[in-house]
Amino acid sequence: MMHRIDRRTFIRRTVQTAIAAAAGGLPVLDLLSMPAQAGQAPPLAVRKGQDIPLLVRETISALDGMENFVKPGDVVVVKPNIGWDRTVELAANTHPEVVKALVQLCLEAGAKQVRIFDRTCNDERRCYMQSGIRPAVESIRSDRVSIEYIDRRSFKELAINGGRAFDRWEFYLPVIEADRLINVPVAKHHSISRLTLAMKNLMGVIGGNRGRLHHNIAESLSDIASVIHSDLTVVDATRILTANGPQGGRLQDVRKLDTLIASPDIVAADAYASTLFGLSPEQVPTVVAAARRGLGVMDLKQVRMV
């Protein structure tokens, strides 16, 4: 059995205190940047297969099952990339079958509620439909599952203690207040950050002018990840976008790998995913910056393959 630091309860309580303080005219409470647990090699599961529901189950089973991450009564956010008005085969968004299978595992583990959302780049209604994610989630037909558009009234500005690029930003309260966050990016090339993986997928749960983050993208994403803790990261590499990311649009830029990567360590997951593009983790600035901040393990020799 793996032992993890559960930061969700900590973050939820500090945010609630911060909001109460702000309402009373006091300064917003700093959210402490919490480093990864020292002295333990984080587990990393990598599996291949063309049957996506089975692939998801086998990958999560290697991490002791979804029950290791989701407890009965938990409110869970499953955060895929739904940012683009692109169809499944173009690899701009997380594969809908990956999302559906993860949601089903959360329900089987006893989740009280599973919420799926993303702050899209293109029109949200088209993104949710064209990606195939809305139809896939709705096909589960459970009143414990909801796929939602972002409610822009639910962003709150919070201070980032020790921020390198920013000392405060707007965060989406439903993801902060959830008991568990499952971060489910698709692996893609990115014209600015080189790759867009789990770290960058967190941009879908922040407010404000996200373009400002691109001026110092590596440190900006580390700032965000120091506040938003992913309890489980699942990188969709069933097909990857090798060029012209993040939006893509050409089938010749897509490579089918039938691969899934999962870990409770967001940095380790991104580090391994970078190798699928022929890169070492040291060549991906977002991975390097996060590892230096103590947000996870970049050296793949220090992870425990399961």
Where are the regions that the model predicts?
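N-terminal and secondary-structure boundary signal
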Residues: M2-V306
